Amino acid sequence: MAQSKRVKAIAAAVVPGKTYAFEDAIKILKTSTKAKFVESIDVAVRLGVDAKKSDQQVRGSTVLPAGTGKSVRVAVFAPAGAKADEALAAGAEAVGMDDLAEKMQAGDLNYDVVIATPDAMRVVGKLGTLLGPRGLMPNPKVGTVSPNPGEAVKNAKSGQVRYRTDKAGIIHCTIGKASFDDEALKSNLQALLLDLVKAKPATSKGTYLQKVSVSSTMGPGVTVDQSSLSLK
């Protein structure tokens, strides 16, 4: 089905202004998923924050209980010894210090996540212009600067997603694949939303989780009725 036809098909199934129970929203997306690859299911969450204010920017990470369905390549900056061994044992594809930095500067950047121990940031700091634009710069707010690199690697590989508000105060995140069953997708979304609630800025006023919409990779969004998510 051509993309324009798919978009029209989803649009035709969605009543403007209506919110849908999570299961119904996912059903609409799955019945319209016709791409030649397994599409991701994404979520957009509009938060009740003023993203222009530094104290109302929301940034963090969540380990999705059902994973993301993606294979994740991880590089770790850690000094030789116990921390480096811990990262390798957890499955990191590359571990090092200056030697790893030199490889990255030479073009070896085929990684989805870069993690660093605090004492390795002196090396990583020199790679800011290289890693920053690619979204790979380690940051303690999202758990990629950690004194426990083994745990950080396990989180990254087991379904950790990172998020931050855009200029409109919206969080965009993947919660799995269209091939996931509904319960897996629901548990992932619940975990994300609960973590977002925990990250609510103290200065945020009014309704915090203003709107939750799900979409497939190639399709428009469907607004979810939050009461169907049983958030506690």
From Swiss-Prot:
One of its GO terms (cellular component) is cytosolic large ribosomal subunit. Transmembrane segments: none annotated. The keyword Ribosomal protein applies. Keywords: Repressor, Ribonucleoprotein, Ribosomal protein, RNA-binding, rRNA-binding, Translation regulation, tRNA-binding. GO terms for molecular function: rRNA binding; structural constituent of ribosome; tRNA binding. Belongs to the universal ribosomal protein uL1 family. Binds directly to 23S rRNA. The L1 stalk is quite mobile in the ribosome, and is involved in E site tRNA release. Protein L1 is also a translational repressor protein, it controls the translation of the L11 operon by binding to its mRNA. This is Large ribosomal subunit protein uL1. The lineage of its organism: Bacteria, Pseudomonadati, Pseudomonadota, Gammaproteobacteria, Lysobacterales.
